[in-house]
Amino acid sequence: MMGRPLFVFLCLLGLAVPACAADAPMSSRPPSTPQADGGQDAGRDALLARLAAAVDPEEADGIVARIDRLNQHSGSDTGDLLLSRAAAAIDGDRVEVARQLLDALTALQPQWAEAWAARANADYLDGDPKATFVDLARALAADPKHLKALADLGALLEDSGRRDDALRVYQHALEIAPQWRPAREAADRLRAAIAGQDL
């Protein structure tokens, strides 16, 4: 049976039955108010448009890196500081400290996708796949085009043996970023694996 976190994920990405949208908990639905300011949103939207039109992987990778840098800023100095300290804690192998910081951050700014994506990373490093799924779902509820969260979800599904679901997630990422190398390589690998399995 599909686990609840995965079910919510697939609902958010349109990969499960249409009725699932009504079944998702309110906390997993997209927020009505964006976290970032209008100027940052406009810059990100422009980068996403360029990403969709990128002609080669090198261009796409560069644009994704710029989007990642934008995603690191919430519009709140306190939020940005908590995220930075959590990243430093992870780099120092202090995952529990990072989780505590990210707990505080997600409570402070529950609409910031990057905070949930960072907490999902800490969950994964702490050996908690269920929490990883839940926090990635929240990241994607806040920002369905968060490429890092999509890539992490695809990898998690692939690691758990859900190749078909993982492929659909990577294909969704490629709809946003057709030339993005990590998603394209993962999708190609999974298509080959699934084709070999079906022979």
Predicted regions and their residues:
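N-terminal leader/linker segments that initiate helical-solenoid repeat arrays
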Residues: 2-3, 19-83
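Terminal, low-structured helical/coil segments at or just beyond the last alpha-helical repeat
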Residues: 25-35, 62, 69, 73, ...
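Alpha-solenoid helical repeat scaffolds
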Residues: 48, 65-68, 103, 137, ...
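TPR-repeat structural position
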Residues: 57-60, 95, 129, 163
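Alpha-helical adaptor scaffolds
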Residues: 76-149
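Register position in tetratricopeptide repeats
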Residues: 91, 125, 159-160, 189-196
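Residue-level signature of tetratricopeptide-repeat
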Residues: 119-120, 153, 187
